[in-house]
Amino acid sequence: EIDGVYVPKYSKIVNKHTKKISECIYTPILTEDAFFPNTFIIEMTRGCANRCGFCLASYLNLPLRSIPYETLKQVIDLGLENTNKIALLGAQISAHPHFHDICKYIYEKIQNGQNIEMSVSSLRVDAITPDVVKTLVAAGQKNSTLAIEAGSERLRRVINKNLTEEQIFNAVKIAKDNGLKGFKFYGMIGIPTETQADLEAIIELAKRVKKENKGFDISFGFSSFVPKPHTPFQWCGREDSKSLEKKSNFLLKELRKIGVTAHVSSI
């Protein structure tokens, strides 16, 4: 009866219930007034197997589960009966065991004359292959988003985003060679253990991408690290706003010098 005092015996224990997902969740109503107008959004996967240390989706929705391939094809066909715009949704759609088959399925429809516009949630660097890019380009995408999170391999290892610089540069080359016009790189500032050298690594990465891929448009979007409950970084404090603003100004200034558009949100 004392306000603010927790008494366990009066509280219910909530058990997490994880089940297989055999049914596909998709947009029930198509309208011009939606955030994505007349777009049929299809959930391909739920959860994520990568377990980046900052990511709530990785831990809240464990384990990674995928919609059955045949079910996805049926739902895609259902959507295309009502609109030509489809979007594939999931925290890690490229981990679907039939992701490349789905891309091929849609690509063949386009090659057979069907007008389809397809978009995907951001892809991992190691998901960029010639076939995936060709499908995106055929479906009307000119640019795509890559979540690299940090500029240095050291800091990516800290957050369990195990991507090398060479993988990033290879993804850019594949994208350019197969028709994409540009990438937007998504990253964070204020990640635990981040140093000035990690920020400078972002600038060096941008310089090399521009140098090796003339005419390929790149931009950066940054947000600040915010600790999430139920993740390995839940007890890491958020960096103070003045420090984040200083880092933000540095990145914006240095990227602008080399002709790269960037914006920072959530400070």
List the model feature ranges, each with a label:
Residues 4-6, 42, 119-121, 219-225:
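Extended hydrophobic secondary-structure segments that form protein cores and membrane-embedded regions
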Residues 10-12, 45-50, 59-62, 91-95, ...:
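Short, glycine-/Ser/Thr-/acidic-enriched flexible segments
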Residues 1-14, 232-267:
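Glycine-rich beta-alpha loop elements in corrinoid/cobalamin-binding modules
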